[in-house]
Amino acid sequence: MKVNPSVKPICDKCRVIRRHGRVMVICQDPRHKQRQG
């Protein structure tokens, strides 16, 4: 899980979602997981 000030989809499998007011990227590739913070 990377924590970045700006989250962007890396590949075409990445999905940008909102959970509890946080913007997150979920993907089949676990290395692409990101959270804004």
Swiss-Prot record:
- UniProt GO cellular component terms: cytoplasm; ribonucleoprotein complex; ribosome
- From the Swiss-Prot or TrEMBL record, give the protein name: Large ribosomal subunit protein bL36
Under NCBIfam families, the record lists: rpmJ_bact
- Cited PROSITE patterns: RIBOSOMAL_L36
- Show the Pfam families listed in the entry: Ribosomal_L36 (PF00444)
Alphabetically sorted, this entry's keywords are:
Ribonucleoprotein, Ribosomal protein
The record's Gene Ontology biological-process terms are: translation
> According to its UniProt record, which protein family does this protein belong to?
Belongs to the bacterial ribosomal protein bL36 family.
Task: State the organism's lineage.
Answer: Bacteria, Bacillati, Actinomycetota, Actinomycetes, Mycobacteriales
